[in-house]
């Protein structure tokens, strides 16, 4: 089973919405979400980064954070969705913007090798 990690800043709006949407779009799949800030609802950590086959981040700043904090070896599994931080959880516009980007990411997720086998 593929493991996907969704990352935004506070793990409050964008990444939880994306995680729920992608779980609906492509079950069965292990999907969780986290934030880059220490105050995030679920702060990103080494274990989450190591376990994920693919890491979908909302902004390039999140990709840089992951590479700087957890190492270059994780850069190849990061997909930047380019979703700015101006939405609230399950906002209709956020869902509308996320869906096509997640569909595109699903193609990358399916093509990504599964290291846990």
Pin down the residues of each PLM region:
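Short polar/charged helix/loop
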Residues: 1-117
């Amino acid at each position: 089973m593929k493991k996907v990690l969704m990352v935004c800043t506070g793990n409050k709006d964008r990444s939880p919405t994306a995680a729920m949407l992608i779980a609906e779009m492509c079950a069965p799949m292990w999907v969780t979400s986290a934030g880059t800030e220490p105050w995030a609802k679920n702060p990103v950590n080494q274990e989450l980064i190591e376990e994920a086959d693919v890491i979908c981040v909302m902004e390039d700043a999140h990709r840089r954070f992951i590479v700087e904090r957890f190492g270059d070896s994780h850069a190849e599994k990061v997909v930047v969705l380019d979703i700015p931080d101006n939405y609230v959880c399950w906002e209709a516009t956020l869902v509308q913007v996320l869906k096509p980007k997640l569909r595109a990411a699903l193609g990358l997720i399916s093509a990504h090798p599964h290291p846990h086998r």
